[in-house]
Amino acid sequence: SKDKNPILIICSYNPAAHQTSVTISDYMEEYGKLGGQRDIIIENMNCKSFSEAPLWSGMMTQILSKYQGEKHPGQIILLGQEAWAAYLSQRDSMQIKVPVMCSLASSNIVILPKDTVKNLDSWMPESVDIFADHMDIPELESGFINQYDIEGNIRMLRTFYPKTEHIAFISDNTYGGVTMQALVRKEMEKFPDLDLILMDGRKHTIYTIVEELRHLPENTVIMVGTWRVDMNEGYFMRNATYAMMEATPAIPAFTPSSVSLGSWAIGGVLPDYRKVGKEMAQESVRMDSQPGDTAKHLSVIGCKAVLDSRKVKEWGLNPKVLPFDVQLINQPVSFYQQYTYQIWSACALFVILVLGLCISLFYYFRTKRLRDELLKSEKDLRVA
């Protein structure tokens, strides 16, 4: 609609990236179905490794400067951790505050570094929580925010491995990796008896991290945070975590983020991830229809405990010892579940064959009886 200010979606990554693409397409489809009237504009920050972090605030300012004055957006949607952090880093300079929604983001953030920060690879920022630290963001009207439960993961791994003395935390060279590492450092202060070993992708390649993993001390448990980009800014898929797994066959691994779950990690306490595109569209329509609503409609995506049943069996663990409920994934499928369709097809075929046999036998005996009666009648007539 030409007379309405547009909705501006600012993505951290290329909109063609799977999670971003699914979220945007679900959002646009649902927004259209709900009768949304605004045009939708998509801008992409194309964030990669953490070495670019000092530039993101300027990129956000540049994007927003294109939509000033009469062209200012009716809503701003921030997709991804980097876009969310970049917005927070420069929101004070914005002349017009429009309603903001964040998604694919988490409650724990780190304030983006300034250009003056030297040695980003060894920079140890403080973890800030938008709820616990009471950040004042009046224009944030809606959001879908993941919360990570590091304490829950430590409780899980200590229940299974009470002799644990060291936790090796793996994080990569991305904003997500740095924020999760900052959260782990903050949460580990609650466990002074545990030693935290940081396996930091800002300082490691996949090859050097594998070498470090081979030399971990006894009574260590690995916590896999995230691994997508290493210090050389090379991108990795699942094969990287397989290489790490092969280097540490005798060390158990857990994950607070679902990375390596199903291949390497035994389990973890992780956000109950779900598709939120449709819910975002409903929120956009609500924000338009209720402009006077000043309440924050923030949907916090809580955590659930998950264990890979194949890994549980492989490591000889008993999920019942955990002090909380747990969801088992990759459970072995029974013969009936695996071949339900074939079993029912075979049963149906058997029933049809039995019915066919019964009908054939009925007509066979009926015909035989009639023939016998005819022969008897013929015999009686001859006698007469």
List each language-model region with its residue ranges.
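Alpha-helical transmembrane signal-anchor helices
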Residues: 330-374
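An alpha-beta-alpha
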Residues: 7, 131-188, 297-309
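Periplasmic-binding protein-like
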Residues: 9-10, 68-80, 99-103, 166-171, ...
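Hinge/cleft segment of the Venus flytrap/periplasmic-binding protein
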Residues: 287-348
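Hydrophobic alpha-helical segments within soluble ligand-binding/sensing domains
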Residues: 108-113, 118-134, 142-164, 272-289
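Membrane-proximal low-complexity regions enriched in glycine and acidic/polar residues
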Residues: 186, 194-295
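PAS/LOV and related PAS-like sensory modules
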Residues: 374-384
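Short, well-structured alpha-helical segments in soluble
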Residues: 52-74, 89-93, 210-219
